[in-house]
Amino acid sequence: MLALNYSLYDCFAQMPFQGHTAAVIDLVQKLDHGLAVKIAKELCQTVTCFVWNDSGHTWVKTISKDGSVWPINHGLLGVARNCLGVQGNGVLDTVSGSFEVRTKGNTVTISLPKLKLDIAEMPERLTQAFDIMPVSVREMGKTCVVELRTVEEIINLETDFNRISKLDYDRVVLTAEDDTVPFDYVCRYFSPKHNINENNGSLYIQTFLAVFWQERLQKNNLSFLQLSPRRAIGRISMSEKLIEVEAPVCKTFEGVLKVL
């Protein structure tokens, strides 16, 4: 029997039970992939992050509740808080790259690569799925980003997840400028093909949303609100090649997981 220390963290959350929950499991050494998938499915969090040290490096492997491996994800914020506590800095190594992180109090900052969106046409089936009239449409691979005119349009979306799941895109992100303090833009993120009707708080989408809004607003420092049911907040700082995402992270649970 294995006895594994694990914790739950609410990421992008100023207080518990907001933002997006991630499980973090401390390991003595790397776990067999099949066993890691089994554990992630049993915990049934959106992501479970397995963390171990090897030759001075902190390695992270993130597995979703459907057993797939996720690269950049909100769980990295929880891992940083778990490893560094309330004050520190370090590097997290993953299969998709290394990410510098630091913590101060309940705030975690992580450096991520910038991703660029391409201009795209608005698919007719997308307008049917959301009943919207976009300002602009961007895409990157299987991700579609739709800009709307007002925050109210984002809030009042009527979603048909059955239709969304039949789109050619794996991810659909809707966003709008927010002209009220303290946020610069808002967003919502739908991914029923990944068994997540609406994502509660995504780190990954900020790698391209921040770039989009930097160009649109001509600002290098931005703040965002993800208008999911649990809401998620964060700040962005832009450099030439990287973005820094700063987000509050709350620890909500710790315990021992016994695995037969």
Question: Predicted segments — roles?
Answer:
Residues M1-L260:
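Active-site proximal loop and beta-alpha junction motif in alpha/beta enzyme cores
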